Amino acid sequence: MTAATFAPGFLWGVASAGHQNEGDNTASDTWFAEHVTPSVFQEPSGRACDGFTRWREDVGLAAGMGLNAYRFSVEWARVEPTPGVYDAAALDHYEAIVDECLARGLAPVVTYNHFTAPHWFAMRGSWLAAPSADRFASYCEVVTRRFGDRISHAVTLNEPNLPRLLSWLHLPGFVRDLERATLAAASEAAGVPS
């Protein structure tokens, strides 16, 4: 086996996604949609990998593998569970992850949005609503003010091309039907006309 040489500054790391890893993301749009019937989700995320409480282990594993970067997402629904109200404990939590990365020699790479958003944001029209960009920018600004000076890189939106890419797969009609049924059930449960 030969050793590869990477350019100085090359980031070799691992990544996690808030909703998929942290668990108990109860204020998010996805959590809400997981708990309606019918649902496109086969199984609710629940505690997921319990990454919200076990994050130090994740960071330690990344450092222990000799990597130099750890990408994680900041869950908007935790940071801003209600419009304009920012949760100091959630910000403390994500700031601690940044600081632990730095202490372990890992470049912290922060993703501001990894598919999920606050439930209140979805109730107000989600990304299609006129003020959505301003709402998202406000959240990003709060997070960046808190620890942006210590992150290596920022990813605004995780895989923004994915919906378009999935549309090319020509999924069977029942998948689209279930997706529409999930959205209708979520709208009904939330008291929003679909």
Task: Kindly label every feature range from the protein language model.
Residues 74-88:
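Glycine-rich, proline-tolerant flexible connector loops at the mouths of alpha/beta enzymes
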Residues 37-47:
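Acidic/histidine-rich helix-loop elements
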Residues 49-53, 88, 130, 134:
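Conserved phosphate-coordination/catalytic loops
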Residues 45, 52, 81-84, 126:
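Short, flexible active-site loop motifs that bind/organize anionic cofactors or intermediates
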Residues 2-39, 63, 83, 92-194:
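Active-site region of glycoside hydrolase catalytic domains
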Residues 50, 54-75, 107:
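Catalytic domains of carbohydrate-active enzymes, especially glycoside hydrolases
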